[in-house]
UniProtKB/Swiss-Prot annotation:
Annotated stretches, region: Disordered: 1-53, 194-234
Name this protein carries in UniProt: Hairy/enhancer-of-split related with YRPW motif protein 1
Gene, per the UniProt record: Hey1
A GO CC term attached to the entry: cytoplasm
Biological process annotations from GO: anterior/posterior axis specification; aortic valve morphogenesis; arterial endothelial cell differentiation; artery development; atrioventricular valve formation; atrioventricular valve morphogenesis; blood vessel development; blood vessel endothelial cell differentiation
The organism of origin for this protein: Mus musculus (Mouse)
Compositional bias annotation for Polar residues: 28-47
Upper taxonomic lineage: Eukaryota, Metazoa, Chordata, Craniata, Vertebrata
Pfam family, one: HLH
Amino acid sequence: MKRAHPDYSSSDSELDETIEVEKESADENGNLSSALCSMSPTTSSQVLARKRRRGIIEKRRRDRINNSLSELRRLVPSAFEKQGSAKLEKAEILQMTVDHLKMLHTAGGKGYFDAHALAMDYRSLGFRECLAEVARYLSIIEGLDASDPLLVRLVSHLNNYASQREAASGAHGGLGHIPWGSAFGHHPHIAHPLLLPQNGHGNAGTAASPTEPHHQGRLASAHPEAPALRAPPSGGLGPVLPVVTSASKLSPPLLSSVASLSAFPFSFSSFHLLSPSTPTQAANLGKPYRPWGTEIGAF
């Protein structure tokens, strides 16, 4: 009885390739004894040299990919914003790069070589990051709830102000670079509805509000080191405390806090300003003393 012979139609090159693959797999697994015993010294040295060259080439390729991804993480604004909070995967960086290029293509090519637009983009990202840090500080360090009036009004005001600045920068894209200190005084500030005075306590303040931003802009450009404080309409305490007229009534930590936030043209009426010289007023308010000067000044 004849046995069925296998089909030898395949070429000898395929068989040699299979043997070579088995040898390479043996090299990768570290079992070199069985693979090298059947080869001549010249063939084994060639295999080892090829494997060594392949490892060097692979390492260089990985280094180029990692360097390119690091540059993309630094250049793409959305990836640069998230790099401090969480570790980005390679696929996420590539996706953010594609989205950024699509956005630039949709904008008609504007921003490719516009250094001012890129600086404004990074500035808005920095402002948003500082806003998130303020919210985290008030909730974690100070222990304020998410429904606390101080936290809600401050965060909503800063968020509204950031939106206004982004809209203003988009409308006036043809202007030159405007520094932070003088940029806040050029555009009238529209107060957030939560920051408006209630029950007629701020009638005098609302009457002077149309001309107030212009005066604040002039004062900010002429005296950038002076904090922009508004005079209170009355001396009594209401639901919203009036702003202290002179900086001498503030405690030293709050003085440094106001000096560091002098560029922001929002009213400090939502903060309970406590002074060591008035212990009775501090006792009546029932609010804990919060020395924010050193923390905010550090930023």
